[in-house]
Amino acid sequence: MKTCIITYTNEKFVSKIQTMISEIREIGKYDGDIVVIIGEDLKDRLQYEDDDRVIIKYFPEIDREENIAKLKEKPITEGWGNPEFNKTFMWHKLYAFHPFFKQWDKCFAMDGGMKIFKPLEKILNLDCKNSILAHYDGYPNNTDWKLRRQFDDTQFPEIFAELEGEFDLDVDYFQATMFIYDTSLLRDDTFDTIIELSKKYFTSKLTDQGIVNLYFNNKKYYNVWEQIQIKDDETYYYDYTERDGLNYTEYIMLKRAHTCPHWSF
């Protein structure tokens, strides 16, 4: 089975990506393909000459000027740092579902800056046939969190009303910080449909996360999200951060490793 790891970076986070790739190779013991998705700011500039299995893949910026102007006029996430217009590169993460990736059977996507503490083999070997594996965002203590909280319902009530009429928003939802999916799920129109959703429902508070759930975690398109394995007898697999007094050494990988002395955001 052909597998690739996908990650993303703009110019600001290049050094974090380089560190993460080193950890994937040296600690994660993964020697397969790694695709780094980039945009305009790194086009024809970022190279990885020391590793011929690191593929730098440029994708063009998607025009969001009209949506961004509306969001600047009526911000939707002031308590969260306004990623809707301050972190617009996050929309580039949607390219993880581009037809380009059909050349692999399984794709393991992760945010730049992820910390790797153990070999990735156990995660890479998880069975994702006909599914997307990812971690529930409300784990473990916020089991009342449903998909509706990922979308603004105040500043743009008319958009929320349309969204609520089209999708079931009272479902659990997954983090888009990391996921593994079977590329047979990629239809000819998958990427275009996801982009259309992202423009129509631009009031997704954490940009890509809500949109990916609309497509892969709802009856209208696909209802194929499965909770990724949390742990086995030897280790925890992945979480956003350490939980319940656990130490980073008890995980394969973390997004934010607060107990790790070498971690910085």
Segments (PLM) and residue ranges:
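Glycosyltransferase catalytic domains, chiefly GT-A lineage
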Residues: M1-F265
